[in-house]
Amino acid sequence: MSSPRLAAAVAALFLVGGASANDLQNFTTVQDTDWTQAGVGGMRGLGSGTITLSGVSGSVTQAYLFWAGPTNSTDPNANAGVLFGGTSIFGTNIGFSQDNFWGFANSQAYRADVTSLVSGNGSYSLANFTKPGVEVNGASLVVFFDDGNDTNNHDVVLFNGNDANFPNPFDALGWNSSLSGINYASGTAAISLHVSDGQNFGGDDDGTLRINGTPILSGGIFQGNTLPSAGGGVDNGNLWDIRTFDVTSFLNPGLNTLNFQLDAINDALGLIVAAVDLPAGAAPVTPIPEPETYALMLAGLAALRLATRSRKARATG
């Protein structure tokens, strides 16, 4: 039988990763790569659409499909099974959050590895993205490839999740995600944000997007007008956006941290993907935990060490 103290210490270690499971989490870092992204909005009420991919000029190494929308289900697999390019796929749930005031119980977001189904540029059909009590807003495709030219490669850090900007019981208030340990020397850097539920409620509906506390854009940032529409959605927006922001000016030679924030104003939004595009060699191999995460880890390790010593003392006493 295991020691209660030992079990508590191990549990504390596991709680480190689960404290804010619905905020964006680091999914993967792809180093020394070429990449592109595409998406489609206007899928609400249809459940189908097409993503037209361009910019691929070499062999595909990884490809990921993301989608999200409101649901009346507590089943994490409620909208996991869909069709991509006519092939059935099953996504991983990457977070529950607020329904963004649509009268549903929640929203759910998903990710699927579609590397084997993406051969290069072209049109990829989407179908079966709605079910009874389950809707979808849009979808994104993120593709990594090798064009044979190492001089134009990047490091890309992918965050994913389902982070609503309005107060809700699923995740922390607003958007607030960080990437630490960026070893920057030179070159351009950018952040691409894939956002669910963008609509136009006026010129100041989205508030202010901040990088490291500095405002970079205010007003109508995510209006549901940055991507092709499948033909559904609502009158004032296609409910899905991808926007890219240059963040080079926020990096200095040496170690850096990038933090991005958006508050809640008039437009309820869900952040699904954040892709941090860095010069090759700049990305940390693994994300470096924030200080509070270190504190929890150290506390758990200390408890584990104490429990182990106590067991040894009882065994020899």
Language-model segments: which ranges?
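A short, hydrophobic C-terminal helix/tail in secreted or cell-surface proteins
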Residues: 289-308
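Disulfide-rich extracellular domains of secreted proteins
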Residues: 21-285
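Sec-dependent N-terminal signal peptides
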Residues: 7-14, 298-299
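Short, charged juxtamembrane terminal tails flanking transmembrane helices
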Residues: 312-317
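Bacterial N-terminal signal peptides that target proteins for export
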Residues: 1-7
